[in-house]
Amino acid sequence: MTKPHKALLLLAFFTLLSTILMAQETGDERAEYLYEKEHPLRETRAVWLTTIGGLDWPRIKATDASSRERQKQELIRILDNYKRANINTVIFQTRVRAALLYPSKIEPWELSLTGKPGQSPGYDPLAFCIEECHKRGMELHSWVVCIPIGTQERQRGYGSASLVKKRPELVKTAKGGEMFMIPGKPETADYIASICKEIVENYDVDGISLDYIRYPESTYNFSDENLYPRASSMSKADWKRENITRIVRRVHDVVKAIKPWVKLSSSPIGKYRDTSRYSAGGWNAYNAVWQDPVYWLKENYQDLLFPMMYFQGNNYYPFLYQWAENSYGHPIVPGLGIYFLDPREGRWTLNEVRAEMHTARNSGIGGIAFYRGEFLTNNCKGIYDTTCDEFFPYPALTARMTWMGDTIAPQAPTSIKYEEGILHWQAPTQITQSNHSYLLYNIYGSNTYPVDVTKAENLLAVNLRDTQWQLNARAQKVRHYAVTAIDRLGNESPAVQEEKPVFELPKHINVPQLINRDVKGTKKTTTGKKTKKKKK
């Protein structure tokens, strides 16, 4: 895109935005008109499910069989609420502060599960969450916090199993007793990659999402510049960015070698760099914490980004546009700080969040993410109702991973039939690609035949793992159905179509008017009207 075209597009973007905001403030009905846009068939709809301190989950500590079951049920209720809102991606905090939510050979159990550091809850929460997400057609991305490992006190609680005891050379204590892994050491990249490798080898995760993949903010007075090679041709700033990129690259190489379809993402600072018109106020990814997520996308080290855009006004919209300009064909899914809807956290209004959601969708950059889950499911200022009714009334597919180079669609399913409220079909008879050996299925339905599988409003269910489906209430209202197969990279097959059987009389048969005898001297037609009986 040329500079003049960019300038015109930017001008149009901000003209539209200012019109929306003015109409919103004045209650002008034009705001609703400007918001109107078809619901997309493909859109990442994500929620960060935060486990540190049990912020979103778990509130119940698993100390015995009864509490363990209640902890599981608590998670099921959360996932059910996500499903009702047509969320399709759950970012599940798996590595918290050098402690994990699964049985590991590398790091200890996270204390939030039982209240005691290093203690097993008696089951595998990561495996359980994956299974429950997949039952509901949702992806699970394992959220890995990379650099911070918590306070000295927290680490002491893990004793000899702590990272501090096992790999002290990788850790440095900063201001306030906060401890961090050292980005300047290449072994740090290897260590974080080993965590991701363990997850991907042992679990059917759909993604690995790296969090805090950056240098600590300046308030911690953290420095590893003593490791900067004096003979380096790079500036110190570029050296720091390379240290962070090395971690991203190492994770990419390890994960993709095992399961190429696993989506790699991160949550960078919400402002990439200062724009030509707007300053990031000293807080951006590139210069403040030495992240270069745009480079990661360019090199395909990452499949998508979830930038933490917990801002308003000129701190949000110009930087959203900046991400859109620098996506290199990858989805950018802005993380919205809906926790600011809570009066204890901020003074955001629902309309402000709606404007951000509409603008993100209209920009076509890839989707929307919410931080964090509790504020969504608690319907803070009506955000859950708005999400369900206005933004996500239908399910959605996630983006195709076209940058992986394989865009060949699988063969269509076969032998579709409807029987007593259940839709059945057969898997494709031919496997044309290696990634087609494991397929999921999408269901579409409408009252017109054939079903148009390009329309979001016809999508009934996504990512089914079985070859049959019990029709839900919405599906029972339509007459025609279609099923597609979809592979791990998001390539979707042609549809196989079926018509729901409905009994209809042949058109050449004349049906006489039915007459019911009522009280003496009258007869009642099917319309319920009474007429006098004629005398003989």
List where the protein language model places each region.
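Catalytic domains of carbohydrate-active enzymes, especially glycoside hydrolases
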Residues: 70-99, 202-206
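Extracellular fibronectin type III
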Residues: 486-516
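Beta-strand-rich modules
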Residues: 469-492
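Substrate-binding cleft of secreted/luminal carbohydrate-active enzymes
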Residues: 290-316, 330-404
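Conserved aromatic anchor
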Residues: 421-435
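Active-site-adjacent "subsite" loops/lids of carbohydrate-active enzymes
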Residues: 42-44, 50-73, 142, 147-202, ...
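Aromatic- and acidic-residue-enriched segments that line the glycan-binding/catalytic groove
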Residues: 100-115, 148-175, 213-232, 277-284
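Glycoside hydrolase catalytic-domain groove-lining segments
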Residues: 230-278, 283-345
